[in-house]
C-alpha cells in the first residue's frame, strides 16, 4: 500500500499520496514487521511466555489469545490507524494506536509480567519497550513534533531491539556463552549508547544546536553498532578456534 501510494505520488503527480507513502511504508511496514515478530520473541527472551503462569495475569482467555481471527482484526485495526494518520483525523488515529500498543504490550509482549530471566537482555528489552509504549502516548500529545519523537520507535525499536534479537540468535545458533546476554558489560554499554542516541535524537528539536544533536545521535548509534559487530566477531572467532582444537 505504501509503495502504491508512492507510485501515485511520483508517476501521476498526486502529491497528496506522498503522506500515505510516508506513513504506510516508512512507519507502518517496519512497525508491524518488527513488533509482529516481537510478539513471539520478546516474551521468549525474557521468559515471560503467555503459556506459563503469567496466563493468569492476562485479560484475554487462552482461546481468544490463540485465535487467528482476533489478531487479524487487531492487525487490520492497527493498520487503519496509519491510513488515517495521513488525514485530518491524525490525532484520533494516534490515540487509538497508543491504546492498541498499550494493549499489545500487556497481552502479547507480557511487558508488565514478572520476568523469569534476569540480566542485561531482559533489562534493555523492557527498557526499550517501556519507552516505546510511553512514546506512543507522546505522539498525539505533541503531534507537531511527531517527526522527531518517532525516533523513539526508530532508534529504540528498529535499532535497539533488532540488535538484541540478532545478538540472541547469534548466541543461540553459534553456541556462544549464554551468560553474555545476562552479564556482559560490553553489551550493556552498547545498549546504553543506543538509548542515549534515542533521546538525543528525539529531543533534538528542543535545543538551538539542532543539527549538532543530530550528529551526536548518529555518532553515538554508529559507535554502538561498530562495538556490537566487533564484540560478536571476536566471540565467533574464539568459538571457531575452540571448535578447531576439538577436531
PLM features: what roles do these ranges have?
Residues 1-247:
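Hydrophobic alpha-helical transmembrane segments of multi-pass integral membrane proteins
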Amino acid at each position: 500500500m505504501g509503495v502504491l501510494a508512492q507510485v501515485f505520488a511520483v508517476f501521476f503527480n498526486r502529491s497528496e499520496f506522498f503522506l500515505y507513502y510516508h506513513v504506510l511504508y516508512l512507519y507502518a511496514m517496519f512497525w508491524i514487521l518488527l513488533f509482529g515478530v516481537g510478539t513471539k520473541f520478546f516474551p521468549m527472551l525474557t521468559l515471560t511466555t503467555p503459556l506459563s503462569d503469567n496466563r493468569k495475569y492476562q485479560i484475554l482467555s487462552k482461546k481468544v489469545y490463540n485465535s487467528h481471527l482476533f489478531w487479524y482484526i487487531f492487525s487490520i485495526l492497527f493498520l487503519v490507524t496509519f491510513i488515517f494518520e495521513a488525514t485530518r483525523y491524525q490525532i484520533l488515529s494516534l490515540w487509538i494506536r497508543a491504546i492498541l500498543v498499550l494493549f499489545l504490550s500487556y497481552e502479547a509482549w507480557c511487558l508488565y509480567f514478572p520476568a523469569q530471566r534476569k540480566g542485561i537482555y531482559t533489562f534493555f528489552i523492557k527498557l526499550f519497550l517501556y519507552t516505546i509504549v510511553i512514546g506512543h502516548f507522546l505522539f498525539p500529545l505533541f503531534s507537531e513534533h511527531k517527526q522527531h519523537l518517532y525516533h523513539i520507535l526508530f532508534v529504540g525499536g528498529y535499532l535497539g531491539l533488532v540488535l538484541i534479537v540478532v545478538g540472541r540468535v547469534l548466541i543461540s545458533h553459534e553456541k556462544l556463552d549464554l551468560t553474555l546476554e545476562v552479564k556482559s558489560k560490553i553489551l550493556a554499554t552498547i545498549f546504553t549508547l543506543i538509548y542515549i542516541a534515542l533521546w538525543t535524537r528525539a529531543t533534538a528539536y528542543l535545543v538551538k544546536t539542532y543539527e549538532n544533536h543530530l550528529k551526536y545521535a548518529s555518532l553515538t548509534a554508529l559507535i554502538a553498532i561498530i562495538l556490537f559487530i566487533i564484540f560478536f566477531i571476536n566471540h565467533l572467532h574464539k568459538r571457531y578456534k575452540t571448535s578447531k582444537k576439538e577436531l
